[in-house]
């Protein structure tokens, strides 16, 4: 029986280059070719995955932008339909919730659920907030900012999610 021994300096030296699998958002999506490479699976550790081949937008990680005149959130929700998504503004926060029941995919049956909560800037016009879902599954939450320092209304208000026909391959820079 072979046991791989890893020195602490080896883990720390490569730690920033190889993200931890413990907090991986890609569970349930199957294996990739680089998951099966013995170099990364046995030499380093079974708890690490080489994720350099994925772009940020494919990973499900959100992008938040706060420009001078607009606050925008881009979130990859490609596994959810508009009926599976709920977007609400509660006081100074926007809450995005997605849930779909168990369904069959290429690897078996899967159900997914997520909750995201973002603090809105104090100068956002909450009455003019929009939210849309592109054909390729990119959710775009946009809130224009007002120049005056008026206090926004503090109540819960659902934001409808509209479907766009064109894909959003990347958020505009």
UniProtKB/Swiss-Prot annotation:
The modification N-acetylmethionine is found at residue 1. Zn(2+) 1 binds at residues 100, 102. Zn(2+) 2 binds at residue 107. The gene is CRYAA. It comes from Tupinambis teguixin (Golden tegu). Residues 153-167 have a biased composition (Basic and acidic residues). Glycans are attached at residue 162. Belongs to the small heat shock protein (HSP20) family. GO terms for cellular component: cytoplasm; nucleus. Its main location: cytoplasm. InterPro entries: A-crystallin/Hsp20_dom, Alpha-crystallin/HSP_16, Alpha-crystallin/sHSP_animal, Alpha-crystallin_N, HSP20-like_chaperone. Contributes to the transparency and refractive index of the lens. May act as a chaperone, preventing aggregation of various proteins under a wide range of stress conditions. Residues 144-173 are annotated as: Disordered. It is found in: Cytoplasm; Nucleus. This is Alpha-crystallin A chain. Heteropolymer composed of three CRYAA and one CRYAB subunits. Inter-subunit bridging via zinc ions enhances stability, which is crucial as there is no protein turn over in the lens. Can also form homodimers and homotetramers (dimers of dimers) which serve as the building blocks of homooligomers. Within homooligomers, the zinc-binding motif is created from residues of 3 different molecules. His-100 and Glu-102 from one molecule are ligands of the zinc ion, and His-107 and His-154 residues from additional molecules complete the site with tetrahedral coordination geometry.
């Amino acid at each position: 029986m072979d046991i791989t021994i890893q020195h602490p300096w080896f883990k720390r030296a490569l730690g920033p280059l190889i993200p931890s699998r413990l907090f991986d958002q890609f569970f349930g999506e199957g294996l990739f070719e680089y998951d099966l490479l013995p170099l990364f699976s046995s030499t380093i550790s079974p708890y690490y995955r080489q994720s350099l081949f994925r772009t940020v937008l494919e990973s499900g990680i959100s992008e938040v932008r706060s420009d001078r005149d607009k606050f925008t959130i881009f979130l990859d929700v490609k596994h959810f339909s508009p009926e599976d998504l709920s977007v609400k503004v509660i006081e100074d926060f926007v809450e995005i919730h997605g849930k779909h029941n168990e369904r069959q995919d290429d690897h078996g049956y899967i159900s997914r659920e997520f909750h995201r909560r973002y603090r809105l800037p104090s100068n956002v016009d909450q009455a003019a907030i929009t939210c849309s879902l592109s054909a390729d599954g990119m959710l775009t939450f946009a809130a224009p900012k007002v120049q005056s320092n008026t206090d926004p209304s503090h109540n819960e208000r659902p934001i409808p999610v509209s479907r766009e026909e064109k894909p959003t391959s990347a958020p505009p820079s």
